[in-house]
């Protein structure tokens, strides 16, 4: 179970990091090089996601969505200095429970 978690985290870092660099370029006036690097990192995210050991694309991406939510809230706390409120936390917990329900049962 550690390998899929590692891939989810690595994919999340690429998706959030790449998206943030594009945000900086388009919304905050950073150079186009920053946007280009962000785009390259987002492409890398798409490749990394294919390394998951689960056979179903839809299930992998649905489960990754829960991980992405948690990582986005952590990013907001660390980078944007925006603390999640109780509804953010409750929603994130519900998402993680959903991810576990989707990934933990063995399927024949």
Curated annotation (Swiss-Prot):
Pfam family, one: UPF0060
Domain of life according to the entry: Bacteria
Keyword Membrane: yes
Keywords: Cell membrane, Membrane, Transmembrane, Transmembrane helix
Compartment(s): Cell membrane
GO CC annotation terms, alphabetical: plasma membrane
Membrane topology of the entry: Multi-pass membrane protein
Disulfide bonds listed in the record: none
Designated name of the protein: UPF0060 membrane protein SAOUHSC_02615
The organism of origin for this protein: Staphylococcus aureus (strain NCTC 8325 / PS 47)
């Amino acid at each position: 179970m550690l390998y899929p978690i590692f891939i989810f985290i690595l994919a999340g870092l690429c998706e959030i990091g790449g998206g943030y660099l594009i945000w900086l370029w388009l919304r905050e006036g950073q150079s186009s090089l920053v946007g280009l690097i962000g785009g390259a990192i987002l492409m890398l995210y798409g490749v990394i996601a294919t390394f998951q050991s689960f056979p179903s694309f839809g299930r992998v991406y649905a489960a990754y969505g829960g991980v992405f939510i948690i990582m986005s809230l952590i990013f907001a706390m660390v980078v944007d200095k925006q603390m999640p409120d109780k509804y953010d936390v409750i929603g994130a917990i519900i998402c993680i429970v959903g991810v576990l329900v989707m990934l933990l049962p063995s399927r024949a």
